Amino acid sequence: MTTETIDGVRLTTKANVYFDGKCVSHSFALPDGTKKSVGVVLPATLTFGTAAAEIMECVGGSCEYRLDGSDEWKQSGPGERFQVPANSKFDIRVTEAYHYICHYA
């Protein structure tokens, strides 16, 4: 199931812009203080580092991702999620706009 709306959030209005605009996101917090971000990755191959563990949820488009230490690219599409450990990194390869929610652990 793909998340289409998130009610009752506190949104940071200034965008987080990475990789010369290839990734743009907005951070928000749920009423219980849980932090997340929602954004889009435009066509590119990028490497992201993580401080906290992350769960990437695809809400539109698709991507291929490769976790740190792996040679295997895996596909992720709408309604699918993948997990990235804390203090790690992952590669993401996008050929069409990839819309996501990042759930921080």
UniProtKB/Swiss-Prot annotation:
GO cellular component term, pick one: cytosol
Keyword tRNA processing: no
Protein origin, superkingdom: Bacteria
Keywords: Glycosyltransferase, Transferase
Enzyme Commission number(s) from the entry: 2.4.2.1, 2.4.2.2
Reactions catalysed: a purine D-ribonucleoside + phosphate = a purine nucleobase + alpha-D-ribose 1-phosphate; adenosine + phosphate = alpha-D-ribose 1-phosphate + adenine; cytidine + phosphate = cytosine + alpha-D-ribose 1-phosphate; guanosine + phosphate = alpha-D-ribose 1-phosphate + guanine
MF terms (GO), sorted A to Z: guanosine phosphorylase activity; purine-nucleoside phosphorylase activity; thymidine phosphorylase activity; uridine phosphorylase activity
Classification via Gene3D superfamilies: Jelly Rolls
Pfam families, alphabetized: Ppnp
Function as written in the Swiss-Prot or TrEMBL entry: Catalyzes the phosphorolysis of diverse nucleosides, yielding D-ribose 1-phosphate and the respective free bases. Can use uridine, adenosine, guanosine, cytidine, thymidine, inosine and xanthosine as substrates. Also catalyzes the reverse reactions.
PANTHER family for the chain: PYRIMIDINE/PURINE NUCLEOSIDE PHOSPHORYLASE (PTHR36540), PYRIMIDINE_PURINE NUCLEOSIDE PHOSPHORYLASE (PTHR36540:SF1)
Entry's family note: Belongs to the nucleoside phosphorylase PpnP family.
Protein name: Pyrimidine/purine nucleoside phosphorylase
Phylogenetic lineage: Bacteria, Pseudomonadati, Pseudomonadota, Betaproteobacteria, Burkholderiales
Gene name tied to this protein: ppnP
